[in-house]
């Protein structure tokens, strides 16, 4: 059903291209995963261009659990251990310990403070000592190989940033309805139309990456 509902937005390749263009312009994208998986849509921004207004939108329109997707090597460089030793979550979402910037924040909860924390974490040469633990930003470790390894929003986010030529770090949060329930694809499409945000799927990113590999081959 996802593909049929998204058909008005073009092919899978065209939807990804629209998303990449939005990210390059400092705007957000909406990414929906497989119907037989979480069947949820995440609002995603590039970490390097994230603004306070965009963070406020994530907090206001989404679940409130704002996550910072990072590649494995960045997680290791920041010495961020897993949140739990044995991850028993349904889809193995790789949360690390939560973080806070050590400098430039007050309580760490405000939109501005969360942006400060994210900028501190993704800075070139960022050190473990730049971050306090725990905090109000939740890093997620992406699997090497991206969506071709794991079809999750974390990997999709990193893939999109790399395909857009941006730093491999993105911020996401699950879109919710006004009544607090999770937004599904019809609501995600309506939300995208309301805010002029392109919509694509994890499957689209898989197809896009496979097409690139086929062209190289």
From Swiss-Prot:
Subunit structure comment from the entry: Homodimer.
Similarity section: Belongs to the DHBP synthase family.
CC cofactor: Mg(2+); Mn(2+)
Annotated source species: Shewanella sp. (strain W3-18-1)
Pathway the protein takes part in: Cofactor biosynthesis; riboflavin biosynthesis; 2-hydroxy-3-oxobutyl phosphate from D-ribulose 5-phosphate: step 1/1
Gene behind this protein: ribB
Protein name in the entry: 3,4-dihydroxy-2-butanone 4-phosphate synthase
The reaction(s) this protein catalyses: D-ribulose 5-phosphate = (2S)-2-hydroxy-3-oxobutyl phosphate + formate + H(+)
Single GO MF annotation: 3,4-dihydroxy-2-butanone-4-phosphate synthase activity
Function: Catalyzes the conversion of D-ribulose 5-phosphate to formate and 3,4-dihydroxy-2-butanone 4-phosphate.
């Amino acid at each position: 059903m996802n593909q049929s509902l998204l058909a008005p937005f073009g092919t899978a390749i065209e939807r990804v291209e629209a998303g990449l263009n939005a990210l390059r312009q400092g705007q957000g994208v909406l990414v929906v995963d497989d119907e037989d998986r979480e069947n949820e849509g995440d609002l995603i921004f590039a970490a390097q261009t994230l603004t306070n207004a965009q963070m406020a939108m994530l907090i206001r329109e989404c679940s409130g659990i704002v996550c910072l997707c990072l590649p494995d090597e960045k997680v290791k460089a920041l010495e961020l251990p897993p949140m739990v030793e044995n991850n028993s979550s349904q889809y193995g979402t790789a949360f690390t310990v939560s973080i806070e910037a050590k400098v430039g924040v007050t309580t760490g909860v405000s939109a501005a403070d969360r942006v400060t924390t994210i900028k501190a974490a993704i800075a070139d040469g960022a050190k473990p000592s730049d971050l306090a633990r725990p905090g109000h930003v939740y890093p997620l470790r992406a699997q090497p190989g991206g969506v071709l390894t794991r079809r999750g929003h974390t990997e999709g986010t990193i893939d999109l940033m790399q395909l857009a030529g941006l730093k491999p770090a993105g911020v996401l949060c699950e879109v919710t309805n006004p009544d607090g329930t999770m937004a599904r694809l019809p609501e995600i499409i309506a939300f995208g139309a309301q805010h002029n945000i392109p919509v694509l799927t994890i499957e689209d990113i898989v197809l896009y990456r496979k097409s690139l590999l086929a062209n190289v081959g």
